[in-house]
């Protein structure tokens, strides 16, 4: 139905002029009737856009429990009023300053994706009104964050962040459901500690790195010392064995001289220069 058509007809009649004579009263009445009819039709219809739902408030019976989907619907003018709700999920960021188990202050930013329970729209309007999310979400998010964060130390908020997020999500969904608000997603987007705590953590990390470096140097020195001891023990044992061999077997010295002479001769044979050596140079004079 074209809502502008009755007003267009009225405008055309005004341009042509009202009938004169005995038909003047009839023409005026028809014009008024058409205008009233068009106005009544226009005020008796309301539209519900996509992603929205509507309920009615009646001056006689109050809020009705019927929920109107998308499309055009009728209402009684001056008696009924349509109340529109956006039922699409809406994001909202809420910050909360709270304390940890070890009394460290931390600023947490929580992002929630919320929407109203369509079947509970009349109850939501009766108890909370149209700005239900503004009335409920900031308070319950702060309450849940404070209760969950107080169970963990500051360091655990970093190492166990997934567990913290899960507890916040579960508790927040339960609290929001009491107000007929559905949460499609809850996430901790930002966790910021105090400057003093951040500086203390950095100092602790530097100290741990220095301690690990010192431990490495100590271990390396200990290993080098152990290597020297083993080498000295080996050399001492070798000297002891050589002394015993010389004492018990006099020919051991001649054997070592022959081995030394062979090594010298082998080295000189590979040289480009020709060198004449006598037996004394090769330590062979004393060999019996």
Swiss-Prot record:
SUPFAM superfamilies (alphabetical): Band 7/SPFH domain
SMART domains: PHB
Membrane topology: Single-pass type II membrane protein
One of the record's GO molecular function terms: mitochondrion autophagosome adaptor activity
Keyword vocabulary terms for this entry: Membrane, Mitochondrion, Mitochondrion inner membrane, Signal-anchor, Transmembrane, Transmembrane helix
CDD domains: SPFH_prohibitin (cd03401)
Subcellular location: Mitochondrion inner membrane
GO cellular component, as recorded: mitochondrial inner membrane; mitochondrion
PANTHER family: PROHIBITIN (PTHR23222), PROHIBITIN-2 (PTHR23222:SF1)
Oligomer status and interactors: The mitochondrial prohibitin complex consists of two subunits (phb1 and phb2). The subunits assemble into a membrane-associated ring-shaped supercomplex of approximately 1 mDa.
Name of protein: Prohibitin-2
Organism per entry: Schizosaccharomyces pombe (strain 972 / ATCC 24843)
Name of encoding gene: phb2
